[in-house]
């Protein structure tokens, strides 16, 4: 009869490899670093699109929503190191800058902050995903153009995916908007979750 200890020693490297593979698969986390558009403004976090996306993906990828209503890019940057350490994400979706624009920050300032965010994400061996942000038309053409240009510039500079702004789809349905004309309401969240799943699917290697 084969000695049990010998069998265990023979299988130990294989078991160790299986364990590492399982842990790697279980560790795939998408961290969403955003503002009120992703935080679920005036609704419970469980009703917001990141939670619905997490439900949709089930165990394929864990979606951690670290979005806070009102956050500027600078505030997001300040929170990022602790989030990276705590969650050790594989991907970080950066949905920030809207509050910078609404407060009239200089586009160069927002650009530099977002650049630092992308640098920090890459330094943590995570993959940044950048979302295009656009401002209401009443902020003026010159400011809007300078602000909107930040995102493709940084996406090219860091060679990272640039996701379309999901609000451009939501704006087409007035019944999906809150009274402030800025934030999507609860009825819009399932659509956003499905739309984001389609955008993210080729980036995280999902079938749905």
From Swiss-Prot:
Q: What is its main location?
A: periplasm
InterPro entries given in the database record: Ester_Hydrolysis_Enzymes, Lipase_GDSL_AS, SGNH_hydro, SGNH_hydro_sf
EC number assigned by the record = 3.1.2.2, 3.1.1.2, 3.1.1.5, 3.1.2.14
Entry-linked PROSITE patterns: LIPASE_GDSL_SER
Q: What are the protein's GO molecular function terms?
A: arylesterase activity; fatty acyl-[ACP] hydrolase activity; identical protein binding; long-chain fatty acyl-CoA hydrolase activity; lysophospholipase activity; peptidase activity
Instruction: Supply one GO BP term.
Output: proteolysis
How does a null allele present?
Cells lacking this gene do not show thioesterase activity and have a little protease activity against Cbz-Phe-ONap. No effect on the cell growth and fatty acid composition.
Thermal activity characteristics from the UniProt entry: Protease is stable up to 50 degrees Celsius.
Q: Signal peptide: which range, if any?
A: 1-26
Q: How does activity track with pH?
A: Optimum pH is 7.5-8.4. Stable between pH 6.1 and 12, however, below pH 6.0, thioesterase rapidly loses activity.
PANTHER family, per database record: THIOESTERASE 1/PROTEASE 1/LYSOPHOSPHOLIPASE L1 (PTHR30383), THIOESTERASE 1_PROTEASE 1_LYSOPHOSPHOLIPASE L1 (PTHR30383:SF24)
Quaternary assembly: Monomer or homotetramer.
Q: Know the name of this protein?
A: Thioesterase 1/protease 1/lysophospholipase L1
């Amino acid at each position: 009869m084969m000695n049990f200890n010998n069998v265990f020693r023979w299988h130990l490297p294989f078991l160790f490899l299986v364990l590492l593979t399982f842990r790697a698969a279980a560790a795939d986390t998408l961290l969403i670093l955003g503002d009120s558009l992703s935080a679920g403004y005036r609704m419970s976090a469980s009703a917001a699109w990141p939670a619905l996306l997490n439900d949709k993906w089930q165990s394929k990828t864990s979606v951690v929503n670290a979005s806070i209503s009102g956050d500027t890019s600078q505030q997001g940057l300040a929170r990022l190191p602790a989030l990276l350490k705590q969650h050790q994400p594989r991907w970080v979706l950066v949905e920030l800058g809207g509050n910078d624009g609404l407060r009239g920050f200089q586009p160069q300032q927002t650009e530099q902050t977002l650049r630092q965010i992308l640098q920090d994400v890459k330094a943590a061996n995570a993959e940044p995903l950048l979302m295009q942000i656009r401002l209401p038309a009443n902020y003026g053409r010159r400011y809007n153009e300078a602000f909107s240009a930040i995102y493709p510039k940084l996406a090219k500079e860091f060679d990272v995916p640039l996701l379309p702004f999901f609000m451009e789809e939501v704006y087409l349905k007035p019944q999906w908007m809150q009274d402030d004309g800025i934030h999507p309401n609860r009825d819009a969240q399932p659509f956003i979750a499905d739309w984001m799943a389609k955008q993210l699917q080729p980036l995280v290697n999902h079938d749905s």
